[in-house]
Amino acid sequence: MVKKNFLMTAPLLMASFCSAQEKPNVVLIMVDDMGYSDIGCYGGEILTPNIDALASKGVRFTQFYNTSRSCPARASLMTGLYQHQAGIGQMSEDPFKQENQKSPNDWGVPGYKGFLNRNCVTIAEVLKEGGYHTYMAGKWHLGMHGEEKWPLQRGFERFYGILAGACSYLRPSGGRGLTLDNTKLPTPEAPYYTTDAFTDYAIRFVDEQKDDKPFFLYLAFNAPHWPLQAKEEDIQKFTKIYREKGWDEIREARRKRMTKMGIIDSSTEFAEWENRKWDELTEQEKDKVAYRMAVYAAQVHCVDYNVGKLLDYLKKNHKLDNTLVMFLSDNGACAEPYAELGGGKVSEINDPACSVFPSYGRAWAQVSNTPFRKYKCRSYEGGIST
């Protein structure tokens, strides 16, 4: 949910924080490739009680826009600039680039270098100068080849997470592995799950703070971006509903709830459906694709649990009342590789060795983006409205 006018006024907003008599803490929580209607407070059936409670006490934006893709949206969010001005007009650096090899995402012009340039300052750099502690946990995706591009060199005091754009939730490794501050980490031992670990480190950074200065915490989950990997107990909460109802009924139920909530008005029409109707699928296809959606929903549900864990920590430590909390997504739901029934094999779901596909597919992505057209990487509402 990267709103254009927020981004363009972000430095001014941060400056006002820095001059305030009682500076608020700022917690910025970003999810990855989540659709407009996925969470409960926007009409979704996915169980997100903590995010819903946060929304009920705050402000929900219904026309909040982004750049339609992960790293350009993050570049704008961190700098308050159009993504080309910051150097990431299309994609960030390839995690598997060889040493002394030019990144395929460096197009040789300033707007398409694939990493944050030095013609911009980040929110973290501005807030740090204004007396804030600055912490980050999660997905960076703003440059990785050379420490000068890493979070600690762009204003953050502490960092734990991935520099790349995606990883295995269960065993991040290699070019998609973990980094703590400026140190690459070995592959973690099982049991491990990125959503939990990122939240634990975010809490740890705040908890280790020795003074009473305000803090800026950027918690950037890699969920629910592919690969489909979730805890079995969470998956089981959703398998029945998607198999029994299917995507046509789920989509219509979301539209009705969104209308009742005032997210959309009663005259809003669905974008044209680009897939088969649920009843046109074979029973085997229904089984497989319903399971994919259940895993996706479980990923979102785990994010909600961890949002609750962070908020509980802040409340118990008397920090919540003076904390501005923002929850947003980098872009719309992802249909990659644009196959109706999803990418990769069902047997690859929850394989720790997978750091890319499997994914949940074009049809469920369109449900996630109810009532909009298209998906991530497209300049339609389904890509840019989150």
Located regions from the model:
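Hydrophobic h-region of N-terminal signal peptides that target proteins for export
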Residues: 11-19
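Formylglycine-dependent sulfatase
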Residues: 2-3, 18-386
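Sec-dependent signal peptide recognition
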Residues: 3-9
